[in-house]
Amino acid sequence: MFLRISGRVRLNSHSLNAQGGGGTNYVEITKAKVSIKNDDRWEILEVPAISGNMVKHWHFVSFVDFFRETDYKDNLTERALRYNGARFGQETKAKKADGSEVELKDESEIIKNFADADVHGFLAPKTGVRRVSLVKTSFILPTEDFIKEVDERLVYAVKHNRVDIDEKGAIKSGEEQTAQMLFNREYATGLYGFEIILDLGFVGVPQSSPSNPVIEDDERKARIVSALKALIPMLSGYIGANLARSFPVFKLEEMIAVVSEKPIPALVHGFYEDYVEVSKNVVENAKKLGFEIEDFGYNVDFGESVSSVEELISKIIEKL
């Protein structure tokens, strides 16, 4: 099963991806440069961004949470229980969630024993074994039409303070004590586009020597379902840092999705103002070439209408 999703979310007062700030009292939000065409003139602009690495991490977190609810919960790396991705170092063996060890010599054995390495990929540099992630995420960026229409700065700073108290609950004072620690943190607001690709048809299938899946059908389905369900928290706001003190004022504005039993073209990123129309052309022409595709849309004229991310995922799971 192969799924492609693009769409747009409204994010107000978010600080989902920060950089720098070490040793300073100023925490800067991550930024990226984008190309925008105004009439016949191209511009390169710096905008706030949420990196694909951050988005992928939060899919990984939710995947682990959902997979731990299945009968195959021990088939995870021990690192996954701490939400660390399958980035092996110089070791030649890795521990499973149940404490047993697996040799990192063969891709088939690794993905058989580690669902997180199967779905999210891995690299074992000591043995030279690797696997490309089946989950691919783009940067989340302010949309080009939003950038053109809004003159306000997309990034702003808010001053915070931490109050230091003693064991009696009183605010500390004195030369060597800090009553208040002031710091500034950047936040951003805007309409953002995203794109996610899930190549779940390759779950359990070695990439080094493609063959039949090396895991049983029931576990394979459990891995696929967990990867699909992991999209639900992501598309409700669980996609970045600083969630405890500034959970994003998040709303999914629109979304398009296509699913097939075989690999299919990617949709156009939600960054582009014409992403729905161009994606529709991609799907229609792909169908003419023989691709069997089911298409879905939320708040847009695109394929079968769905009322939420949850309904989309439910419809896809029903087809497994």
UniProtKB/Swiss-Prot annotation:
The entry's keywords: Antiviral defense
Transmembrane segments: none
One biological process term in Gene Ontology: defense response to virus
One of the Pfam families matching this protein, by short name: DevR
InterPro entries (alphabetical): Cas7/Cst2/DevR_sub_I-a/Apern, CRISPR-assoc_Cas7/Cst2/DevR, CRISPR-Cas7/Cst2/DevR
Coiled-coil regions listed in the entry: none
Family per similarity comment: Belongs to the CRISPR-associated protein Cas7/Cst2/DevR family. Subtype I-a/Apern subfamily.
Purpose of the protein: CRISPR (clustered regularly interspaced short palindromic repeat) is an adaptive immune system that provides protection against mobile genetic elements (viruses, transposable elements and conjugative plasmids). CRISPR clusters contain spacers, sequences complementary to antecedent mobile elements, and target invading nucleic acids. CRISPR clusters are transcribed and processed into CRISPR RNA (crRNA).
Name of the protein in question: CRISPR-associated protein Cas7/Cst2/DevR
